[in-house]
Protein backbone atom coordinates (compact mmCIF):
# COMPACT_ATOMS: atom_id res chain seq x y z
CA UNK A 1 0.00 0.00 0.00
CA UNK A 2 1.34 3.39 -1.00
CA UNK A 3 0.67 6.38 1.21
CA UNK A 4 2.19 9.68 2.17
CA UNK A 5 3.57 12.63 0.22
CA UNK A 6 7.22 12.67 -0.77
CA UNK A 7 9.24 15.55 -2.18
CA UNK A 8 11.53 14.24 -4.90
CA UNK A 9 13.87 15.82 -7.41
CA UNK A 10 14.02 15.21 -11.15
CA UNK A 11 17.41 15.71 -12.76
CA UNK A 12 18.13 17.53 -16.03
CA UNK A 13 17.77 14.28 -17.99
CA UNK A 14 14.28 13.63 -16.59
CA UNK A 15 15.30 10.92 -14.11
CA UNK A 16 13.67 10.65 -10.71
CA UNK A 17 14.18 8.22 -7.86
CA UNK A 18 11.29 6.33 -6.32
CA UNK A 19 11.56 6.64 -2.50
CA UNK A 20 13.50 3.72 -1.01
CA UNK A 21 10.58 2.65 1.18
CA UNK A 22 8.58 1.66 -1.95
CA UNK A 23 11.29 -0.05 -3.98
CA UNK A 24 11.00 -3.49 -2.35
CA UNK A 25 7.21 -3.40 -2.64
CA UNK A 26 7.48 -2.55 -6.34
CA UNK A 27 10.16 -5.20 -6.87
CA UNK A 28 7.90 -7.85 -5.30
CA UNK A 29 4.66 -6.70 -6.94
CA UNK A 30 5.86 -6.02 -10.47
CA UNK A 31 9.61 -6.64 -10.69
CA UNK A 32 10.16 -2.87 -10.57
CA UNK A 33 8.06 -2.18 -13.66
CA UNK A 34 5.60 0.70 -13.44
CA UNK A 35 3.17 2.31 -15.84
CA UNK A 36 3.03 6.10 -15.87
CA UNK A 37 0.19 7.91 -17.62
CA UNK A 38 -1.74 11.18 -17.71
CA UNK A 39 -4.34 12.00 -15.08
CA UNK A 40 -7.69 12.74 -16.70
CA UNK A 41 -8.73 15.58 -14.37
CA UNK A 42 -5.51 17.23 -13.18
CA UNK A 43 -2.20 18.14 -14.79
CA UNK A 44 -0.35 15.42 -12.96
CA UNK A 45 0.61 11.83 -13.69
CA UNK A 46 -0.68 8.51 -12.42
CA UNK A 47 1.88 5.85 -11.50
CA UNK A 48 0.76 2.21 -11.28
CA UNK A 49 2.64 -1.00 -10.58
CA UNK A 50 2.52 -2.81 -13.93
CA UNK A 51 0.42 -5.62 -12.42
CA UNK A 52 -2.19 -3.12 -11.19
CA UNK A 53 -2.28 -1.42 -14.61
CA UNK A 54 -2.89 -4.81 -16.25
CA UNK A 55 -6.12 -5.09 -14.23
CA UNK A 56 -7.26 -1.55 -15.02
CA UNK A 57 -6.46 -1.45 -18.74
CA UNK A 58 -9.32 -3.77 -19.86
CA UNK A 59 -11.79 -1.58 -17.96
CA UNK A 60 -10.53 1.51 -19.77
CA UNK A 61 -10.64 -0.28 -23.12
CA UNK A 62 -14.25 -1.32 -22.44
CA UNK A 63 -15.48 2.27 -22.11
CA UNK A 64 -18.04 3.21 -24.79
CA UNK A 65 -16.30 4.59 -27.86
CA UNK A 66 -19.21 6.86 -28.82
CA UNK A 67 -19.18 8.65 -25.47
CA UNK A 68 -17.05 11.78 -25.88
CA UNK A 69 -15.86 11.91 -22.25
CA UNK A 70 -15.00 8.20 -22.26
CA UNK A 71 -13.08 8.56 -25.50
CA UNK A 72 -11.10 11.48 -24.08
CA UNK A 73 -10.28 9.41 -20.98
CA UNK A 74 -9.11 6.52 -23.18
CA UNK A 75 -6.93 8.83 -25.24
CA UNK A 76 -5.27 10.28 -22.16
CA UNK A 77 -4.93 7.12 -20.10
CA UNK A 78 -3.93 4.71 -22.85
CA UNK A 79 -2.33 7.21 -25.20
CA UNK A 80 0.12 8.48 -22.60
CA UNK A 81 0.68 5.12 -20.84
CA UNK A 82 4.37 4.29 -20.72
CA UNK A 83 5.98 1.29 -19.05
CA UNK A 84 9.15 2.14 -17.15
CA UNK A 85 11.57 -0.02 -15.19
CA UNK A 86 13.38 1.06 -12.05
CA UNK A 87 17.15 0.95 -12.54
CA UNK A 88 19.60 -0.33 -9.92
CA UNK A 89 19.34 2.98 -8.05
CA UNK A 90 15.52 2.98 -8.00
CA UNK A 91 15.31 5.64 -10.71
CA UNK A 92 13.13 5.93 -13.80
CA UNK A 93 13.47 8.18 -16.81
CA UNK A 94 10.25 10.09 -17.46
CA UNK A 95 9.66 10.66 -21.18
CA UNK A 96 9.41 14.30 -22.34
CA UNK A 97 5.76 13.82 -23.37
CA UNK A 98 4.77 12.99 -19.80
CA UNK A 99 6.97 15.72 -18.31
CA UNK A 100 5.40 18.26 -20.67
CA UNK A 101 1.84 17.08 -19.95
CA UNK A 102 2.30 17.64 -16.21
CA UNK A 103 4.42 20.81 -16.59
CA UNK A 104 7.27 19.32 -14.59
CA UNK A 105 10.35 21.17 -13.52
CA UNK A 106 12.96 19.98 -11.03
CA UNK A 107 10.82 19.69 -7.87
CA UNK A 108 8.13 17.00 -7.77
CA UNK A 109 5.73 15.45 -5.25
CA UNK A 110 4.97 11.72 -5.24
CA UNK A 111 1.67 11.11 -3.45
CA UNK A 112 0.66 7.60 -2.39
CA UNK A 113 -2.98 6.73 -2.98
CA UNK A 114 -3.22 3.09 -1.93
CA UNK A 115 -2.63 1.00 -5.05
CA UNK A 116 -1.15 3.84 -7.10
CA UNK A 117 0.67 7.16 -6.89
CA UNK A 118 0.06 10.60 -8.27
CA UNK A 119 3.12 12.51 -9.44
CA UNK A 120 2.81 16.31 -9.36
CA UNK A 121 5.02 19.29 -9.90
CA UNK A 122 5.65 20.60 -6.40
CA UNK A 123 4.11 23.96 -7.27
CA UNK A 124 0.92 22.41 -8.68
CA UNK A 125 0.60 20.03 -5.70
CA UNK A 126 0.70 22.79 -3.11
CA UNK A 127 -1.66 24.94 -5.19
CA UNK A 128 -4.15 22.07 -5.45
CA UNK A 129 -4.23 21.34 -1.74
CA UNK A 130 -4.47 25.06 -0.91
CA UNK A 131 -7.43 25.34 -3.28
CA UNK A 132 -9.79 23.24 -1.18
CA UNK A 133 -13.28 24.61 -1.60
CA UNK A 134 -15.48 24.38 1.47
CA UNK A 135 -18.36 23.91 -0.93
CA UNK A 136 -16.88 20.68 -2.30
CA UNK A 137 -19.24 17.88 -1.49
CA UNK A 138 -18.10 14.51 -0.27
CA UNK A 139 -18.99 11.58 -2.50
CA UNK A 140 -22.00 9.61 -1.27
CA UNK A 141 -19.76 6.60 -0.58
CA UNK A 142 -17.80 8.58 2.01
CA UNK A 143 -20.84 9.62 3.98
CA UNK A 144 -21.16 6.09 5.39
CA UNK A 145 -17.55 5.97 6.62
CA UNK A 146 -16.52 6.57 10.19
CA UNK A 147 -12.98 7.93 10.28
UniProtKB/Swiss-Prot annotation:
GO MF terms held by the record: DNA-binding transcription factor activity; transcription cis-regulatory region binding
Subunit-structure text: Forms oligomers.
Chain ranges passing through the membrane: none
Family classification: Belongs to the MraZ family.
Biological classification of the source: Bacteria, Pseudomonadati, Pseudomonadota, Gammaproteobacteria, Cellvibrionales
HAMAP family according to UniProt: MraZ (MF_01008)
Signal peptide span: none
Highest taxon of source: Bacteria
InterPro entries: MraZ, MraZ_C, MraZ_dom, MraZ_N, MraZ_sf, SpoVT-AbrB_dom, SpoVT-AbrB_sf
Listed SUPFAM superfamilies: AbrB/MazE/MraZ-like
Domain SpoVT-AbrB: 5-52, 81-124
Keyword field contains Glycosyltransferase: no
Protein name: Transcriptional regulator MraZ
An individual GO BP term: negative regulation of DNA-templated transcription initiation
Keyword line: Cytoplasm, DNA-binding, Repeat, Transcription, Transcription regulation
Subcellular localization: Cytoplasm, Nucleoid
Gene that this polypeptide is encoded by: mraZ
A Gene Ontology cellular-component term: nucleoid
